[in-house]
Amino acid sequence: MAEMSYRTALVTGASSGLGRGLALWLARRGVRVFAAGRRLPQLQALRDEAQAAGVTVEPVELDVTKADATLERIRALDAEAGGLDLVVANAGVGGTTNAKRLPWERVRGIIDTNVTGAAATLSAVLPQMVERKRGHLVGVSSLAGFRGLAGHAAYSASKAFLSTFMESLRVDLRGTGVRVTCIYPGFVKSELTATNNFPMPFLMETHDAVELMGKGIVRGDAEVSFPWQLAVPTRMAKVLPNPLFDAAARRLR
């Protein structure tokens, strides 16, 4: 693994799941971590766990669906930290959105968090990182973003947005000193997947997924996809002709 070069990091969606795990993973390696999320009690419990281990995690109450407030708060954190070295846009929500009964409220909730919230989180520090000629932006997308999955129109589309957003940032920021990484998890045990009522092949333990994420981020990988058993066929499905993909997708409903 490459040498850890981060002094400070912000991880959104750190109340549980991958965000919580990554915040602890970074803190245990000497990084001062700002753990952001909507549920302050869970963040305070995370801080206490970190303190018991002799490391630093600072809770930050933040609702990324409120874009203007998110921009303001993260910019203030950047100034307080003397420049955030790593920002991980991890906050996300799921939920089914069957096109036959497409509830706008649910669609909007997914877009507000997964699209607007992620873009605001990363945009808040991007100009400062470019000016400093250093920094690392990470977006947590999903393997579900490669094709439109049945019953997940809003979720798949929101993750497709983030994937393309991160790719464009990576191209634009080449040579600036700012690195860009996009994470593509498959199914990971978390609050997000606990309510799923459909098969989840190659379901991963959270700590295993966090280890893959953390190592990929530190290496500066452009993309980190896991588990490979699901990542490989998912990427191959990207080039399937529509009739073949549609037939396969119908079987997965």
From Swiss-Prot:
The active site is at Y155 (proton acceptor). Pfam families: adh_short (PF00106). It is an enzyme of class 1 (oxidoreductase). Its EC number is 1.-.-.-. NADP(+) binds at residues 10-34. GO terms for cellular component: membrane. One of its GO terms (molecular function) is oxidoreductase activity. Substrate binds at S142. Keywords: Oxidoreductase. Gene3D superfamilies: NAD(P)-binding Rossmann-like Domain. Transmembrane segments: none annotated. CDD domains: SDR_c6. It comes from the Bacteria. Belongs to the short-chain dehydrogenases/reductases (SDR) family. This is Uncharacterized oxidoreductase MXAN_5909.
